[in-house]
Amino acid sequence: MSFDINWNKINEDSTINQRARAFLNEHLESLQLPSYVSNIKMTDFKLGTIPPRITLKQIDNPLDDFYEALRLEGASIGGRDTDVQFLMEVDYKGDMLIELSAELVLNYPSPNFMQLPVKLTISDIGIHSLCLVAYLQRQLFISFLCDVSDPALDNVESPLDSNGPAFLGSKAVERISLIRSIKIQTEIGPQDLSEGTILRSVGKLEQFLSDVFKNLLRKEAAWPSWINLDFNEDVSADVESSSSAEESLPHRDDAQDFSADARA
């Protein structure tokens, strides 16, 4: 079963781009940079106009691991009637664009002999993996299990234990690339000069950034890790907003409806 995604609505949500920039900049600031680069930061993030192709493989109850994560956070576990988990095949070959700035450090003939401004553009990101998406207690958990072409899973119908919702193994991160392809273009030097100041394809820097993004996504989103989106925060904000509106307009009754449509 395949799904059509209203990608335009997602792409128009400015908070997604803002959160992506904040998250990646926080990670970049924590990196121990090699001696030939400094002051690296993200300057722009565009989700792109091309959506992933998603195929539903299985519907099941959420893994116990997700409930345990909620318990550790101190969240109360209510009824499970609306909790659900999907196993999906995600095929993404879109036009996401990431731009970064940095300074290339020349350490010859002496340390920090020269620093050149660098502009880096990351594009052509390709992902083709199996992914778990679980919705429980108004929270969404997303975790990538394996690359579709992984030979270790060629003869396995599902990475879920047939006797219950328990994932087989806890070291999937060791056998998943997740980002299968990535293109990095580098420009070095002042952008207003035209001769001899712009260098392209700086191999070491591009390889470093490629490894950074691949390792980051595997660390944060590949099983046994996951991305967690908490919609309870949005509900709390809506409640506070409604309370303020009722105080200013005591005779007005407000109602909010939420609906989500997926075309199979």
Curated annotation (Swiss-Prot):
PROSITE patterns: SMP (PS51847). GO terms for cellular component: endoplasmic reticulum membrane; ERMES complex. Residues 240-264 are annotated as: Disordered. It is a peripheral membrane protein. CDD domains: SMP_Mdm12 (cd21672). One of its GO terms (molecular function) is lipid transfer activity. InterPro entries: Mdm12, MMM1_dom, SMP_LBD. The keyword Signal does not apply. The keyword Transport applies. GO terms for biological process: aminophospholipid transport; mitochondrial genome maintenance; mitochondrial outer membrane translocase complex assembly; mitochondrion inheritance; mitochondrion-endoplasmic reticulum membrane tethering; peroxisome organization; phospholipid transport; protein insertion into mitochondrial outer membrane. Residues 248-264 have a biased composition (Basic and acidic residues). Residues 1-232 form the SMP-LTD domain. Belongs to the MDM12 family. The SMP-LTD domain is a barrel-like domain that can bind various types of glycerophospholipids in its interior and mediate their transfer between two adjacent bilayers. HAMAP family: Mdm12. Component of the ERMES/MDM complex, which serves as a molecular tether to connect the endoplasmic reticulum (ER) and mitochondria. Components of this complex are involved in the control of mitochondrial shape and protein biogenesis, and function in nonvesicular lipid trafficking between the ER and mitochondria. MDM12 is required for the interaction of the ER-resident membrane protein MMM1 and the outer mitochondrial membrane-resident beta-barrel protein MDM10. Component of the ER-mitochondria encounter structure (ERMES) or MDM complex, composed of MMM1, MDM10, MDM12 and MDM34. A MMM1 homodimer associates with one molecule of MDM12 on each side in a pairwise head-to-tail manner, and the SMP-LTD domains of MMM1 and MDM12 generate a continuous hydrophobic tunnel for phospholipid trafficking. This is Mitochondrial distribution and morphology protein 12. It comes from Eremothecium gossypii (strain ATCC 10895 / CBS 109.51 / FGSC 9923 / NRRL Y-1056) (Yeast). The gene is MDM12.
